[in-house]
Amino acid sequence: MHKDRISGRAEGASAICTAKKRGLLAALCAMLLCSCSPVSRTPEPTTAAPYEDENTAGYEQLTEESAREQQRFSKLETSLFQDELSSARLDLHFLLKNPESRGITQTDAPIAPVSAEALRQTRKDQEDLRSELSSFQTALLTEDQKLTLRILESLMKTEAKSNGLELYSQPLAPTIGTQAQLPMLLCEYTFYTRQDVEDYLNIVEYLDTFYGQILSFEQEKAAAGLMMSDTSLDHVIESCKSYLLVPGNNFMIDSFKERLNTLPDLTDDARKELCARNEAALEEHFVPAYKLLIDGLEKLKGTGTNEKGMCGYPDGKAYYEYLVYTETGTSYHSIDELLDATEQEISDNLKITSKLLSDHPELESMLEDYHYRQTEPSAIMEELKEQTLQDFPQLPECSYTLKDVPKALELSLSPAFYLTSPIDDSSQNVIYINRNPIYDNQPLYNTIAHEGYPGHLYQTVWFHTHCDSDLRKILNFSGYSEGWAAYVEALSYELDNGLDPLLGELLSANSKATLGIHAYLDLAVNYLGWEQDDVQKYLSSYFSDPQSIAGSMFETMVDNPANYLSYFIGSLEIRNMRKTAEMQLGDAFNAKQFHTFLLDMGNAPFDVIQAYFTTWLMNQKMGN
């Protein structure tokens, strides 16, 4: 299954991840104070040299060669796109409403396989693709093709970091693992035709086979000394127990019946027969699949002896570095640079909060009881649509559905998540909201800004309706997508939303600092080797009772290495570009134009975006 089919917030947002036939994708679309005066900081330069293409051929020769090269690249794009989506029925269904229109008529498996062998084949295919990409003469391609080529080259360079480290892959995790997210995808498997129902039932019936593959992979990890700790295993097992459904009345049965109701011309007898088959598939395959995982993982207890973060494994530091770059697509050159930048961002934002509280002591009492103008999800979405018109380009009208996470799954899933629409039908957008009281401290207004307008839904629909490359539409770079959502979430505190403007500024700075603290701990635990005592000591600088949260924070970082970084580092990259543009353009800076540039770029690693940002900035200076 493609990574990041579900886009969500930082508490548990990202990955359903397995090998691909062609191995193209690291990620595919899928989801968190002291007393001194603020110091003005010039942002670190975040521009890269613009791309330059050299070609000395004559005009007639260039035109002929260009046509051939462009056609060759177009064929490669089509081939990659079709290969990726034909590898698994589940991915294909979520990404294309009408696959036949893209030349795809069959798939290799209900769900893409999970195994070390499949991952090794992925790496080999990626090396072959990397070699093929290097054969293109960039100067002869169209501008859009050049961008796609550069994105693919960057992606393949990052993926090469994981060569030989296949057994470090983590398909299971408490809230962002396959076992936690797959049921929600099944609940949203749209029935356009009767055949879709048959395909869905085949996937459910395949689930025990698929989870058997995952268990075999975990057993291979254990034999290699790479198994997760018993603490992490307990978290995953607890997640699995949420899906031991009660027969006859559960969310999987209810959602199936609701989707059947959307099918026209289905007789009552056919409906009853399909419902009976679904209940049988759940009882005979879905629940046994989770029991298989639970029993198998229980037997693996004691095989995982690493109680530290990722760096506690033999090559864990190298694998974590790969995770950092694949999750962020960052333009920073080293993890040490990321640590420094994260520390600086935390400090800058805490200085802002300190200055605000010092200059406006009344804000302290406001923090204890504040309210947004809108509190209902649909009203918040509509207000945000209006609020964003000033600084963001207008999105064509699109439909969306807001749903609550099933009560039985609240403890196993993120605070909220967005299910992306098919690339050929942007009308299907679903946002799930987790109503569990443990998330009451996360204001719904900002959560919906992250997931809806101007966050994931807005950015995804914009890209689907403005990008001509089908291949690019199925590539997802978490640093860009989650970075964008975290960036606009922070902005949402300062909209005209019913809050006192100074309070909004305070909450925005505090949210950025808090996310930064999580990101720093992610790096410190998984790269520097911090233990729980180190985490508690670090937290004591920011929280009055660090002992009460140090344990859970440490375990979260161990369970989900690099998860927080896509949110924080991605949003930091965007803020750095904005600060650079504001500094160099002065009064000529236009937020809507800056956001339009980023939206038009779409999903891409920041090392590529930076070079295009340099060109955009030069054009802005010249008034173009």
Model-derived features: where do they sit?
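N-terminal maturation segment of proteins
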Residues: P38, A48-N624
